[in-house]
């Protein structure tokens, strides 16, 4: 066997986080789905909608 064919198996915990790529969660409620990560906000879309005006975002129609 060559070095590239080694049988090292990653830990199941590490493998699951790498598989989904989901490393962040909402800073307010902890939800892991529907995250707004732009500008490193890391809020779920529901929390972002509730507090976005207070953060200085404006809603355009």
UniProtKB/Swiss-Prot annotation:
Keywords in alphabetical order: Metal-binding, Ribonucleoprotein, Ribosomal protein, RNA-binding, rRNA-binding, Zinc
Cofactor binding notes: Binds 1 zinc ion per subunit.
Native organism: Haloarcula marismortui (strain ATCC 43049 / DSM 3752 / JCM 8966 / VKM B-1809) (Halobacterium marismortui)
UniProt region (Disordered), positions on chain: 1-25
Function of the molecule: Binds 16S rRNA, required for the assembly of 30S particles.
Cofactor(s) demanded: Zn(2+)
Entry's family note: Belongs to the universal ribosomal protein uS14 family. Zinc-binding uS14 subfamily.
Gene Ontology molecular-function annotations: rRNA binding; structural constituent of ribosome; zinc ion binding
Protein name as annotated: Small ribosomal subunit protein uS14
GO biological process, one term: cytoplasmic translation
Subunit description: Part of the 30S ribosomal subunit.
Sequence ranges of Acidic residues compositional bias: 1-12
PROSITE patterns: RIBOSOMAL_S14
Gene Ontology annotations for the cellular component aspect, listed alphabetically: cytosolic small ribosomal subunit
Residues that hold Zn(2+) according to the record: 26, 29, 44, 47
Superkingdom in the source lineage: Archaea
